[in-house]
Amino acid sequence: DKIKFVHMCFSTDPFMYKQPEISALSCKLVKILNKEGIKCTVLTKGILPARLAEYGINNEIGITLVSIDENFRRKWEPCAAPFADRIKALKNLHERGVKTWISMEPYPTPNIIKQDIREILDAVGFVDKIIFGRLNYNKLVSDYKGRVEYYNKLSEQVIKYCKSNGIDWYIKEGT
């Protein structure tokens, strides 16, 4: 059986912020896999190189984005690329024909950060797919009264937004 795709993600982030040697190696891997007819799906908190568009449009390239508030990023994702830079790089790839997606997880509760999910959705309204999921295994989330209803409401908002903008979506089980 032939490998259908390889998923490169943040557990060993293929495009670590401020790590050009990792980014270069990841680009080489994508290129090699694509030459063998293997699609790549990529997820990063780094900045996506523009040259990914040169490898073909069958790949699916995504970023993690759970906020657009830089104070939140500095506290919760201190080594990740600024949100605006992630979005800009992803949009560049999308405009060049690459399939793009957003992982909006782990999405925080209001006792962690008060924010309007519609602002985030509007910032990434160009993508082909949005994956949404709750923040798990966190005492602050567990302490938030009404968390189940909160995540249900947000899931409905994501679905409604995606339907009205022609975007595919996936809501993680248990959200």
Describe the residue ranges of each PLM region.
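Conserved AdoMet/S-adenosylmethionine-binding subsite of the radical SAM
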Residues: 1-162
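C-terminal accessory regions of radical SAM enzymes
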Residues: 155-175
